[in-house]
């Protein structure tokens, strides 16, 4: 949408990358890198790591990689190709003896992720130690494709072919048509929790960019399994309620939000319309300073037993993404490269603040 108005998106894109580079976002890794949790206890307690992109932590490192390369590709701007353009820096006042600083750019970060992927046999890079999630590796694949489009090469093709072969041992999907979620790296074993709606729709939304056949062959049964009918033709998605004692007892609408995104990506306009209708009828949408969003609301269900929960991730991002996306949006981004002719067309390339 708005292909001739890059100025509308350029500054917000830069601010989002700057926010992602803030230590408030990435310093959690020092704690998570020590492991010794329910799914990585076999590794024992590991030494803490400050560098948030050198090993594992793919959910964070891949978003930085793909965002920087996507910025370069969409705006034809090598801003993050400069040495040190992606620097992770913390300067504490009362501890740390000078702090920590890790300098990268879009090329060196892409190379680091590529070699990790190779070292792991293309199965994927772990998020938390020992936990290789299918979902979390998809943004890295998008980043590899953007790198290919900007600099040439075929990294994305190599990685996706290797990924399919590596996951053939476990299955990208289960026999029942739901997506597998993660493999424990040390044990080389598939963890098989009950199917999760968010996992089906989150992975489906992303992997559609390079493997649309597996998504579109399974989405109809997945949406039929998770949807619940609601008044006036609307519908909601059965939420994945964590067992007691497994993480903080927070409520959310991730399953609902990712179902909307996936419906938009696969072109299921009927499901998308029904989900958005439910959100507008029952999720208390708000207009504030030009922004339309759904405010946080705790508690899983209303007094009718229907989904009531809302969280910032869903209310601020996922439902907006679902509204703005076009059918096969990520797939087209991945497979239909912009040409030099696109950038030669007249365009709005700059604008004043506040417009």
What are the roles of these predicted feature ranges?
Residues 6-24, 61-72, 85, 103-117, ...:
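Hydrophobic core segments within long, regular secondary-structure runs in both alpha-
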Residues 21-28, 171-177, 231-234, 284-292:
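Boundary/linker segments of alpha-helical solenoid repeat arrays
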Residues 2-131, 177-180:
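Extended ligand-binding groove/face enriched in aromatic
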Residues 86, 93-108, 119-254:
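Extended ligand-binding clefts on enzyme/binding-domain cores
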Residues 1, 52-66, 131-139, 194-202, ...:
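Aromatic- and histidine-enriched alpha-helix N-cap/loop-to-helix transition segments
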Residues 4, 151-152, 266-270:
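Short helix-adjacent coil turns
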Residues 39-45, 68-70, 74-78, 84-87, ...:
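Terminal, non-catalytic domain-edge segments
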Residues 30, 149-150, 336-338:
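General N-terminal targeting signals
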């Amino acid at each position: 949408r708005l292909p001739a108005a890059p100025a509308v998106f350029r500054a917000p894109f830069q601010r989002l990358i700057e926010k992602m580079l803030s230590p408030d976002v990435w310093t959690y890794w020092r704690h998570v890198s020590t492991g010794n949790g329910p799914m990585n206890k076999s590794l024992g307690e590991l030494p803490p790591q400050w560098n948030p992109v050198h090993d594992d932590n793919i959910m964070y490192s891949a978003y930085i990689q793909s965002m920087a390369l996507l910025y370069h590709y969409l705006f034809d701007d090598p801003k993050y190709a400069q040495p040190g353009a992606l620097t992770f820096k913390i300067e504490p006042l009362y501890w740390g003896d000078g702090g920590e600083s890790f300098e990268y750019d879009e090329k060196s970060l892409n190379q680091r992720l590529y070699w990790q992927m190779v070292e792991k046999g293309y199965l994927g890079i772990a998020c938390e130690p020992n936990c290789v999630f299918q979902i979390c590796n998809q943004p890295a694949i998008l980043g590899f494709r953007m790198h290919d489009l900007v600099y040439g090469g075929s990294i994305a093709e190599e990685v996706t072919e290797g990924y399919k072969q590596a996951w053939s041992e476990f299955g990208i999907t289960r026999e029942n048509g739901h997506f597998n979620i993660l493999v424990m790296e040390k044990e080389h074993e598939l963890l098989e929790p009950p199917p999760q709606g968010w996992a089906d729709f989150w992975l489906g939304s992303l992997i559609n960019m390079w493997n649309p056949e597996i998504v579109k062959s399974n989405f109809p049964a997945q949406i039929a399994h998770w949807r619940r009918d609601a008044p006036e033709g609307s519908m909601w998605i059965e939420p994945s309620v964590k067992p007691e004692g497994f993480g903080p007892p927070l409520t959310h609408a991730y399953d609902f939000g990712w179902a909307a995104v996936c419906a938009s990506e696969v072109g299921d306009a009927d499901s998308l319309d029904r989900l958005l209708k439910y959100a507008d009828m029952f999720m208390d949408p708000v207009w504030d300073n030009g922004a339309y969003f759904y405010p946080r609301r705790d508690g899983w269900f209303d007094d009718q037993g229907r989904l009531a929960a809302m969280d910032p991730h869903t209310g601020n991002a996922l439902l907006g993404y679902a509204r703005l996306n076009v059918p096969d949006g990520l797939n087209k981004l991945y497979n239909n490269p912009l040409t030099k002719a696109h950038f030669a067309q007249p365009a709005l390339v700059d604008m004043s603040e506040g417009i």
